[in-house]
């Protein structure tokens, strides 16, 4: 919210309904099919536009900026690398360090354990600096690394511009966060997803984010009314959502650390800060019941809610790999229909964006209602940097942005 207060909020911003396609569109400014990633990298086919191989004719904004004198860094999740290239052997052309980022610290893939991630430093696997028992969390770790990198640049090359891509594993499953963050939402979802949808729509109308005559879409097939659920369902479902909400707020706290660091360095007012709330709509991948272990849901392994009840306090912790049920995904995509993976409906593609640049934008606290897409980010960055759209990058003629 503070970023929006310092700039503008975009409430009709859209992604591709999936992770990898959104990320390649974000980083290149081109349609995801023209960039070769029509779906998540792991399910690539040999079909044109869906082989997960970004061609050299589609350069990333990181490479464009690097070639124009910017320091470039990436921390967090990178999910636009072909699955067969994700190994210690490479090739590394489509890893972050091969796509214009001079530094990379994070993981390559769709998701990872937030307490014990599969970490990479550039192209080499490394162990986390400490364990979950010692207080480790991936979001905090990459925020530490991002701040350290920015401070190092500020000391060594204070006048050199930089481009930093911070891509949290949150709030993708598993929804891992410490108990103190989960406890902040204890009981807040006992009212159920139907009541939350009603409240969310009312708040959106009050803030002018949707027209006054906006109506809610119906529940997806198979999702029951909250009042029709039994006590076991309500207890488990509410707890899974508490963990998600705690993780979301914890992530916002890490973003606040980034802006605070920029302010401390005296660079915040001159920094174009773009906050994108996700690469797709809320996910239905937890199934109708949600799950204590998302890998069970993804592999079609049945679970019994009664088996989760004794482990409620473990949800969000190192022994879990949790994901909320579909009903909560529908609620979080209010007022739209459907969820992540469904590109035909705004429930899959609608993601809010906040953008600030105090010394570069006159607007403060406004809302932009125009229809925007993730491919609009790169031309915005180039215009802000005073750079033209490149026609050649490293000798390769570029597809138009």
Go through each PLM region and give its residues:
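Formylglycine-dependent sulfatase
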Residues: 1-401
């Amino acid at each position: 919210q503070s970023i929006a207060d310092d700039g503008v909020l975009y409430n009709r911003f859209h992604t591709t309904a999936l992770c990898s396609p959104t990320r390649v569109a974000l980083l290149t400014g081109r349609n995801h099919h023209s960039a070769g990633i029509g779906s998540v990298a792991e399910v690539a086919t040999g079909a044109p536009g869906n082989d997960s191989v970004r061609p050299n004719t589609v350069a990333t904004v990181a490479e464009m900026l690097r070639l124009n004198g910017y320091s470039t860094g990436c921390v967090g999740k990178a999910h636009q690398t072909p699955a067969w290239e994700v190994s210690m052997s490479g090739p590394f052309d489509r890893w972050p360090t091969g796509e214009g980022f001079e530094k990379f610290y994070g993981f390559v893939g769709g998701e990872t354990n937030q307490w014990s991630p599969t970490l990479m430093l550039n192209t080499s696997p490394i162990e986390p600096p400490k364990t979950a028992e010692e207080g480790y969390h991936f979001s905090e770790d990459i925020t530490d690394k991002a701040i350290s990198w920015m401070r190092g640049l500020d000391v060594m090359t204070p006048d050199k511009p930089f481009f930093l891509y911070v891509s949290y594993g949150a709030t993708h499953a598993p929804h891992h966060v410490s108990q103190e963050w989960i406890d902040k939402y204890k009981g807040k979802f006992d009212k159920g997803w139907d009541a939350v949808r009603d409240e969310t729509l009312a708040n959106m109308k009050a803030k002018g984010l949707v027209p006054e005559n906006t109506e809610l879409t119906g529940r997806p097939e198979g999702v029951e009314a909250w009042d029709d659920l039994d006590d076991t369902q309500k207890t488990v479902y509410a707890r899974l959502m508490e963990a998600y909400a705690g993780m979301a707020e914890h992530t916002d706290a890490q973003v606040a650390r980034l802006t605070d660091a920029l302010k401390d360095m005296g660079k915040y007012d001159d920094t174009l800060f773009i906050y994108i709330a996700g690469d797709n709509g809320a996910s239905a991948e937890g199934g109708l019941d949600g799950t204590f272990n998302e890998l069970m849901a993804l592999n079609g392994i049945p679970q019994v809610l009664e088996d989760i009840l004794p482990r409620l306090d473990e949800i969000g912790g190192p022994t879990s790999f949790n994901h909320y049920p579909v009903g909560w995904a529908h609620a979080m995509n209010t007022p739209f229909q459907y969820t992540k993976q469904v590109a035909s409906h705004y429930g899959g593609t609608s993601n809010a964006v906040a953008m600030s640049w105090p010394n570069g934008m006159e607007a403060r606290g406004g809302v932009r209602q125009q229809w925007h897409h993730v491919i609009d980010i790169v031309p915005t960055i180039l215009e802000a940097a005073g750079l033209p759209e490149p026609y050649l990058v490293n000798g390769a003629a570029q597809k138009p942005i």
